Amino acid sequence: MSNSSFHASLADDFERFKRALPRDFPAHVRDVYRINLSARYLDEPLPHPIGKGSGQLSLNLGQLETDAAAGLAFAVLKTVIAQDSAGTQSMAAWAIHETKMKVERLGEGWTVTWKGRGWDRSFEDYLALVRASWDLTASGALLAVPSVKYHLPRLGEPFRDEEYAFTTRALANAWGRSPLLLEKDFSPTLAGDRLADEKAQILRWLREVPQRIRAHANVRLAMKLMNARFDDDFQAEMMNAASGADALVVFNRLFDVERGVAYGGSELSTRNLRVLDRPSGRQAVRPPLSGTGNIHSGRLIVEYALRGCSSVQLHTFFQLPLEEYPATEGSRTQRALHALIFDPRDGLIAVMLERERANTLHRRNGELHFLDLCAPRAN
C-alpha cells in the first residue's frame, strides 16, 4: 500500500473509531499501516508510547481498570509520601487533600490547576493499591507503577534513611516481583518550595537519592525531574546529576510562585523541548527518557520522541470536557487515545507517515518503528 493509500485508510479509521477503538489497536495499526508503535518505560516493553502521569487520575483501582480497558500502555500511581515504621513523614506537608482540579484553556492548549499535593490516605491503603496494580501488570492488562516522594534534606543535613528503608521495603513486598518498578517524584510544588532555592541542594538530591532507595530493595528507578526555578543550563545539569537513575521523566510542570499553583500549557512544552534539544540534553549515554508536558497530539509525542523519549506521560489531556474530543463515545482515556493515534493531521500515525514522505523516517523490514524516532542525533 502506498503512503497516500495509508492516509485514505487513516481518514476512514478516524471516523470509524469515534465510537470505540479496536480492542488491540496497536495490532490494528501494525496490520493496516505497517507501523510498529512499540515503546519502552523503565526498560519495560509497551504496546505503544502513551501512558498516564502520576496524579488524581490514578489513585484507585476503578481508574486503572478503565485505563486498561481503553488500551492505555501504562500508568503511574498517585505519589505516596514516604514514612518510617512509626508512620512519621518528614515530607508530611505534601500529604494534604487535593482541592478540586480546574481544567482551563491556556493559549492554544489546556492546563489543569490545583493546590493539592500527594496521597492523603493511609499507607496501608496505598499498599493495597500497589498490590492491585501488580495484578494488572502481571496480567498484561496495564503496567501500573507506584510513585514516592522521599525525604529530601537541606545541605549539611543527613537523609532520613529509616523512611527510605521502611517505605521501599513495604512497596517491594506489595509489588510482587523483583525488581520493584518505582518512580521518584520531584514535584512542581517542591520546585516552588524554599527547599529548592539552592542549586547545590537539588544536585545533591539527584545524585544521592537513587543509592538511598536501592540500599533497601532491588529497584528499577525512574526519577521525574522538576522544572527548577533556574535557567535551561541548570535543567541540563539536573539531568546529568540524575544519571544514577534507570530512567528520567522530563520534565514536571512549571510553578507559579505568585499564585502558588503548578501549571502546564505551551510554555511547559516549549521549555521542555528546548532543554532536550540542547546537545547536553540529548546525550547518547544517559538514562532512557520518558517525556511529559503539554502533550495533546501525536505531533507532540513525536517531538518528544525526536529528543530521545521512548514513551510519554499525559495528565491534562485525559481531563478535557467531553465535547473537546473528536470521539463521541467511550471513557476520556479512550477518547484521548483515539485523537492521539488516529487524528488524520496531527495523530501519531499521520505524523510518522509524514516523516516517511519527507524521507526522515524509514521502514525496516517493511515497517515504520516508533522507537526509530528516538535514535540519538548527532550533536
What are these regions (language model features)?
Residues 49-51, 74-76, 141-153, 179-183, ...:
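Structural preference for beta-strand elements that scaffold enzyme active sites
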Residues 1-169:
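N-terminal capping/small domains of soluble enzymes
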Residues 54-57, 149-151, 225-230, 286-299:
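Glycine-rich beta-to-alpha transition loops that act as phosphate-gripper elements at the mouths
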Residues 1-30, 101-102, 120-121, 267, ...:
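Alpha/beta catalytic cores of nucleotide-metabolism and tRNA/nucleoside-modifying enzymes
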Residues 159-220, 226-227:
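Metal-dependent enolase-superfamily TIM-barrel catalytic cores that perform enediolate-based chemistry
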Residues 24-33, 183-201, 225-285, 321-331:
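Glycine/Thr-rich beta-alpha phosphate-binding loop at enzyme active sites
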Residues 61-66, 159, 230-242, 281-285, ...:
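Catalytic cores of alpha/beta
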